């Protein structure tokens, strides 16, 4: 059986923590920022964990992470 391929798009967007959770950056911070408050933009800078409902699918497209 051939090797499984890693989704390169996902590999660039997610990192695995020491405990095996997937860390990601938040969306909505590339443009149209003038109507967002400073507090909102500051909170968007923080990384967050991937939701548990998506972890099963993420493990399939990131087999070696």
UniProtKB/Swiss-Prot annotation:
The keyword Coiled coil does not apply. Keywords: Ribonucleoprotein, Ribosomal protein. GO terms for biological process: translation. GO terms for molecular function: structural constituent of ribosome. One of its GO terms (cellular component) is cytosolic large ribosomal subunit. SUPFAM superfamilies: L35p-like. PANTHER family: 54S RIBOSOMAL PROTEIN BL35M (PTHR33343), LARGE RIBOSOMAL SUBUNIT PROTEIN BL35M (PTHR33343:SF1). Belongs to the bacterial ribosomal protein bL35 family. This is Large ribosomal subunit protein bL35.
């Amino acid at each position: 059986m051939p090797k499984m391929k890693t989704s390169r798009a996902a590999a660039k967007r997610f990192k695995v923590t020491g405990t095996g959770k997937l860390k990601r950056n938040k969306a909505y911070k590339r443009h149209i920022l003038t109507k967002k408050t400073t507090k909102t933009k500051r909170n968007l800078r923080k990384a967050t964990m991937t939701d548990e409902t998506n972890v099963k699918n993420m493990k399939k497209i990131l087999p070696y992470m």
